[in-house]
Regions:
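A recurrent flexible, glycine/aromatic-enriched loop bordering the glycosyltransferase active site
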Residues: 207-229, 290-292
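A short, conserved alpha-helix in the catalytic core of glycosyltransferases
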Residues: 220-238, 243-271
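Conserved donor NDP-sugar-binding/catalytic core segment of glycosyltransferases
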Residues: 152-194
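Active-site-adjacent helix/loop segment of glycosyltransferases
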Residues: 259-362
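Glycine-rich, basic loop-to-helix element that forms the pyrophosphate-binding segment
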Residues: 118-137
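N-proximal low-complexity "stem/linker" segments adjacent to membrane-targeting elements
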Residues: 2-66
């Protein structure tokens, strides 16, 4: 049985400037949502979707969230492009149909959809933090389902698979999803592993998903795109550090969890189709779309800076002077290699990286102090979370994006 429900505006707080494309997309998708008794609502979960200036992927992601068999009780849309000046709330009802013979009328369950601005966020996780700080998220919420606007659930059971895994692995501190390309056929990663002072994937980026990695569970790191993050984890590990940026904050957060005695679990049955718009050059650093007829933007510098931040904070601070001197030698070698490959921009990036690292030492000092304070074991004491021998290693894409 299907029917249509019109969302009810419950917060008259948006001014004329807030009547934006993003509001129109949300309202249209809610108005056009086919109502189904096959859906249920879990009020313990709040989904947070961060949205950039580029809206090409958002409607597909929001629609995929609305199709979930288990809906989050709260769906937060965090706009990072100054289109939402004040919070706005919409609601819609779901009447789940229990299995078996129905003897009583099922009770309505309400889903809140909240639009908020996150204009000054410096990373994905910072936008999520800013969004949920602007309203009362509710005492019943126990976890956040974090999504980029270009990371859509690849099927209707994505959140359900996450919740089942959380129920069966209650000690998991963070649960991540299998990362696929936007069509949902090629793999990006299925969790990541520690390898010296970096993290690597044991997946060849783009290889067909044939469920060959679906036996994985405990890993060293997962992408935050599509991750289920318990609020207790955020509190226990002092939140996610935005200093690492969108390309690096997931690596640091997962590292602190693993070294602090927590568990990072990948749920291969939960599938996220991730366009990785900024990494793939489809989106500029400021969130604007790259024109279809223009060359893709090169994300090389942002990715390398994230890798460098991770490397510095992964060693004792007394090693930093030697690491910096070594980075100069490495920059010369990598710069020459990039020039030989006719990549002058990347060569310039490599040559400037040692100097770009210096202003960030204060942030690195704080990050390293947090790791030492929270850490209980070393990465070497976690052999099952280490990468295999070199022939089996494949460097994955940027974690958290």
């Amino acid at each position: 049985m299907h029917e249509r429900r019109t969302p009810v505006r419950t917060l008259e707080t948006m001014n004329d400037n807030a009547s934006s494309d993003i509001q129109g997309i949300v309202t249209d998708l809610l108005n056009g949502r086919p109502y189904s008794h096959r859906q249920d609502v879990d009020s313990s979960v709040a989904a947070v979707i961060t949205v950039q200036e580029d809206l090409r992927f958002f409607d597909s992601t929001f629609e995929a969230v609305l199709r979930q068999r288990i809906l989050p009780g709260t769906i937060v849309v965090a706009d990072c492009a100054r289109r939402v000046s004040q919070p706005m709330q919409l609601t819609f009802d779901v009447i789940p149909s229990p299995a078996g013979v129905i003897t009583t009328m099922p009770e309505n369950k309400t889903v809140r959809v909240i639009l908020v601005g996150a204009d000054h966020a410096v990373s994905f996780a910072d936008a999520v933090r800013s969004a949920i700080a602007q309203f009362d998220i509710g005492a019943e919420v126990r976890a956040l389902w974090m999504l980029h606007d270009d990371s859509r659930p690849a099927d209707d059971s994505c959140l359900e698979a996450m919740l089942d895994a959380w129920k069966n692995t209650p000690m998991a501190s963070l649960l991540g999803a299998k990362q696929l390309d936007w069509p949902g056929r090629g793999l990006h990663d299925v969790g990541m592993y520690a390898d010296g002072h970096k993290v690597v994937s044991l997946v060849v980026d783009g290889e067909p998903d044939q469920e060959q990695y679906d036996g994985r569970s405990d890993v060293f790191a997962v992408s935050l795109a599509g991750a289920l993050v318990p609020l207790a984890t955020l509190k226990a590990w002092d939140g996610i550090d935005p200093w690492f940026g969108t390309f690096g904050e997931s690596r640091d957060f997962c590292r602190r969890i693993c070294l602090g005695g927590g568990r990072v679990v990948v749920v291969p049955q939960a599938r996220i189709a991730h366009a990785r718009a900024r990494f793939e050059g489809l989106r500029l650093r400021n969130g604007h779309a790259v024109d279809d007829d223009a060359e893709p933007a090169d994300s090389y510098l942002a990715v390398r800076e994230a890798q460098l931040k991770y490397a510095y904070t992964d060693v004792h601070r007394t090693w930093w002077p030697l690491l910096w001197l070594w980075s100069i030698v490495l920059a010369l070698g990598l710069g020459v290699r990039c020039l030989a490959a006719k990549q002058p921009y990347r060569a310039c990036c490599e040559l400037t990286l040692p100097w770009r690292a210096l202003p960030g030492l204060r942030g690195a000092w704080r990050a390293r102090a947090r790791i030492r304070r929270q850490g209980k074991v070393s990465a070497k004491a976690l052999p099952t979370l280490q990468a295999g021998p070199p022939p089996k290693r494949q460097v994955g894409g940027p974690l958290g994006y």
